[in-house]
C-alpha cells in the first residue's frame, strides 16, 4: 500500500506497520481465525467514508448528508442476505462479540438462562465464560463434547436443556473441527420452546459455499465475524428471521452502539461481493482439502488430533504425547516463522495460559496460494521443530522464508 503521507507525518508508526508487514510476508500464518484481505477490502477500509457519522439505519438517520453511505450500507446488507439466503441482515456490529451481545439483549432479560458450549471444549468467551459479559449478565450453563469421540454430545445437550429449560441455546465454536448438526439443535430448542442462536464466525465461509450445512434455515439468529474465513475487514454481522429484525436493529443502535463505521461497512460489502464469486468457492474448497492433508500428515508424525481429524478449516492438536505445552509450542514455532496459538483442549488439565494444545487453520495460507504439497512441508517443519527443539533451527526458518517468497501476500500488487 502507498504510505507516502504517513512516511512524512509519522515515520515512527510507519516503522511499526512495516515490521508487521514483514512478519506477515515471511511467516506461515496458521492461526485459524486469521486471514489476508484483498487490496480492495483495504482500499475501502482506508477510504474517506471513515469521516461520515451515520447514526441510525439507511433512510432513517440522525444526521444529514447520509444519502451515499445509505447506498453503501444497503449494498452490504443485500449482498449478505444473498450470500446466506437470510431474511434480515444487520452489518453494523463492530465485532462478533458485539453481534452476540446484541442478540442476547434483543430478546432476553438479564439473568435469563442460556445454554452454550463450554469454552474449553471449543466454545467462545461470549458463550458464557464467567470472565466475559455473557457470563456476568446471564445465567449460562454449558454443554460439551463426549470424552471418547471428542465430538458434541447431543444427548448430553438435550438432557441439560430438558433439565434447565434455558431461554436460548447457543451453538457454534471457536475451536471445534467437526460438522455441527444444527437441525438436531433446532429440534431440542423446539422441545423446550427456546430461541436458537448460532455463532458461525469461524465457519461462515464454509457455510456460504455449501461446505458446511447452513444454520440459517434453523436458527432464529445467526451471528458472524466478517474476517476469518470470509476474508473481510475485522467486524461483525447478524442474520435473523424477519420477525426479529426490529428487536435486533434496536439492540445494536441505540442499544449497544452509536455511529456505525461506514468505512468498515464498505469493506464488508466488498468482501461479501468477493464471497459471491465462483473463485471464492474454489478457495474454500482448497481450504478444506489443505486442512485434511495437513491433519493427516501431522497424524503420520504422531500428533494427536482432537476428534481424530477435521471436517472444516481447523485442527485442534493435543501435544501431551510430544512432551511440550501449547504455550511452549507457540513460542517455538514462532521462532522459526510458523504462527499458531496455544489452545485448551477438551477436559483440559493445564491453565488456559499454558494449555495442552494448539489450534491451527489453513484459511490464511490458502489465500496465499498454498496447496497440498505445501501442507506436507508445513507438517514436516512443525514436527522437525518440535522434535529438535534443543537444536539450532535456522535452516528451517530459512526454508519457511523461501516458501513465503514463492507466494507473496498480494501477488498482483
UniProtKB/Swiss-Prot annotation:
InterPro entries attached to this UniProt entry: PyrdxlP-dep_Trfase (IPR015424), PyrdxlP-dep_Trfase_major (IPR015421), PyrdxlP-dep_Trfase_small (IPR015422), Ser_HO-MeTrfase (IPR001085), Ser_HO-MeTrfase-like (IPR049943), Ser_HO-MeTrfase_PLP_BS (IPR019798), SHMT-like_dom (IPR039429)
N6-(pyridoxal phosphate)lysine found at: 228
Record-stated family: Belongs to the SHMT family.
Sites annotated Plays an important role in substrate specificity: 227
Protein name (record): Serine hydroxymethyltransferase
Pathway terms, separated by semicolons: One-carbon metabolism; tetrahydrofolate interconversion; Amino-acid biosynthesis; glycine biosynthesis; glycine from L-serine: step 1/1
Species annotation: Clostridium botulinum (strain Loch Maree / Type A3)
Annotated (6S)-5,6,7,8-tetrahydrofolate binding sites: 119, 123-125, 351-353
Compartment(s) where it occurs, according to its Swiss-Prot or TrEMBL record: Cytoplasm
Keywords in alphabetical order: Amino-acid biosynthesis, Cytoplasm, One-carbon metabolism, Pyridoxal phosphate, Transferase
EC numbers for this chain: 2.1.2.1
Top-level taxonomic group: Bacteria
Single Gene Ontology MF annotation: glycine hydroxymethyltransferase activity
Enzyme class: transferase
Catalytic activity line of the entry: (6R)-5,10-methylene-5,6,7,8-tetrahydrofolate + glycine + H2O = (6S)-5,6,7,8-tetrahydrofolate + L-serine
SUPFAM superfamilies attached to this UniProt entry: PLP-dependent transferases
Cofactor(s) listed: pyridoxal 5'-phosphate
KW Cytoplasm (keyword) present: yes
Amino acid at each position: 500500500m502507498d504510505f507516502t503521507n504517513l512516511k512524512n507525518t509519522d515515520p515512527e508508526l510507519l516503522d511499526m506497520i512495516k515490521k508487521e508487514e514483514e512478519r506477515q510476508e515471511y511467516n506461515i500464518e496458521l492461526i485459524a481465525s486469521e486471514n489476508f484481505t484483498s487490496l480492495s477490502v483495504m482500499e475501502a477500509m482506508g477510504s474517506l467514508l471513515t469521516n461520515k457519522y451515520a447514526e441510525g439505519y439507511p433512510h432513517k438517520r440522525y444526521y444529514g448528508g447520509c444519502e451515499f453511505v445509505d447506498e453503501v450500507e444497503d449494498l452490504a446488507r443485500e449482498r449478505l442476505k444473498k450470500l446466506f439466503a437470510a431474511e434480515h441482515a444487520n452489518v453494523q456490529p463492530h465485532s462478533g462479540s458485539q453481534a452476540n451481545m446484541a442478540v442476547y439483549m434483543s430478546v432476553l432479560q438479564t439473568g435469563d438462562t442460556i445454554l452454550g458450549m463450554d469454552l474449553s471444549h471449543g466454545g467462545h468467551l461470549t458463550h458464557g465464560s464467567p470472565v466475559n459479559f455473557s457470563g456476568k449478565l446471564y445465567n449460562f450453563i454449558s454443554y460439551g463434547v463426549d470424552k471418547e469421540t471428542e465430538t458434541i454430545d447431543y444427548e448430553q445437550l438435550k438432557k441439560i436443556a430438558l433439565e434447565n429449560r434455558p431461554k436460548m441455546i447457543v451453538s457454534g465454536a471457536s475451536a471445534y473441527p467437526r460438522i455441527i448438526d444444527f437441525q438436531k439443535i433446532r429440534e431440542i430448542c423446539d422441545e423446550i420452546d427456546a430461541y436458537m442462536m448460532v455463532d458461525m464466525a469461524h465457519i461462515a465461509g464454509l457455510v456460504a459455499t455449501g461446505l458446511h450445512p447452513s444454520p440459517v434455515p434453523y436458527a432464529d439468529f445467526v451471528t458472524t465475524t466478517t474476517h476469518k474465513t470470509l476474508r473481510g475487514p475485522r467486524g461483525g454481522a447478524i442474520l435473523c428471521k424477519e420477525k426479529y429484525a426490529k428487536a435486533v436493529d434496536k439492540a445494536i443502535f441505540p442499544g449497544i452502539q452509536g455511529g456505525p463505521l461506514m468505512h468498515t461497512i464498505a469493506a464488508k460489502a466488498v468482501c461479501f461481493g468477493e464471497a459471491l464469486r465462483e473463485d471464492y468457492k474454489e478457495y474454500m474448497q482448497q481450504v478444506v482439502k489443505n486442512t485434511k492433508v495437513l491433519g493427516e500428515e501431522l497424524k503420520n508424525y504422531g500428533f494427536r488430533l482432537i476428534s481424530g481429524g477435521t471436517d472444516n478449516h481447523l485442527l485442534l492438536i493435543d501435544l501431551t504425547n510430544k512432551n511440550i505445552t501449547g504455550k511452549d509450542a507457540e513460542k517455538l514455532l514462532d521462532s522459526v516463522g510458523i504462527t499458531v496459538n496455544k489452545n485448551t483442549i477438551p477436559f483440559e488439565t493445564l491453565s488456559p495460559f499454558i494449555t495442552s494444545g494448539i489450534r491451527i487453520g489453513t484459511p490464511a495460507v490458502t489465500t496465499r496460494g498454498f496447496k497440498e504439497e505445501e501442507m506436507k512441508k508445513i507438517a514436516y517443519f512443525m514436527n522437525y521443530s518440535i522434535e529438535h527443539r534443543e537444536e539450532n533451527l535456522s535452516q528451517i526458518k530459512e526454508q519457511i522464508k523461501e516458501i513465503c517468497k514463492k507466494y507473496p501476500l498480494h501477488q498482483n500488487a
